[in-house]
Amino acid sequence: GKDSMYVDGNLQGRYGETHKVSALETLQFSTISLIDDVTRCVTMDSKVAGDLVYVLGTTRNELGASEYYAHLGYLGRNVPEVRPDEFAPSYRHLMHAIENGLVASAHGIYRGGLAVHLAMVAMGGNLGLEADLTQVPGGGKMRDDVLLFSESAGRFIVTIDPDKREAFEDIF
C-alpha cells in the first residue's frame, strides 16, 4: 500500500463526463519491528477444535459511527475512544504470552465488532466456536447487540490450548 494524506480518483459520470472525487485527508501510520523468532508469530485463524476462546480488553457501549449503527441508519454519539495507558499493559501481556508459546491465534477486534471478528477467526480455521457473552470483559449489564457490535478499541480475540490455560491466565 501507500502512505498518503491524499486519496483522489476520477469517476466516470452517467454521460461520459469525469468527476474528481477526493477522500477526506487522513493521517496514516506504518510501523515496523524486529521479530526475534518468527516461529513464535501467530495468525488470526483458530487452530484446533476445543481450544479456549478469550476476549482481551474492555468492551464499552461505543456503537457511535459503527458498522452496526450504519446498517440501522443511526449515527450515534458514543464513538470508540483510544486509551493508550489502558491498552499498553494488555498488549505487553499478550506479547509475553505469544513469546512463551501460549497463544494459538490472536486477532484484533475493530470494524464490525466482536461478532464479525469471532466469525473471521472461526472461518479462518474452518471451525465453529462457542462464546459466552457473560464472560466478555465490560459486558456486565450491556445488551447482547452492544457486546457483539461495539467497536471499542484495544481488544483481541485469543485462542489457546486448554492445557495452557493456567499459564496464560497467570500472565493476565
Regions found by a protein language model. Name each.
Residues 83, 87, 111-114:
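Hydrophobic alpha-helical segments and helix-packing faces
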Residues 6-8, 12-28, 75-76, 97-172:
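Glycine-/charge-enriched secondary-structure boundary and capping motifs
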Residues 1-3:
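Gly/Pro-rich turn-and-neighbor structural signature
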Residues 5-6, 36, 60, 138:
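Residue-level detector of flexible, active-site-proximal loop/helix-junction positions
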Residues 91:
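Phosphate-sensing "switch" segment of ASCE/P-loop ATPases
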Residues 15, 21-86, 95-98, 152-153, ...:
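Mobile "lid/hinge" segments at catalytic clefts and subdomain interfaces of large enzymes
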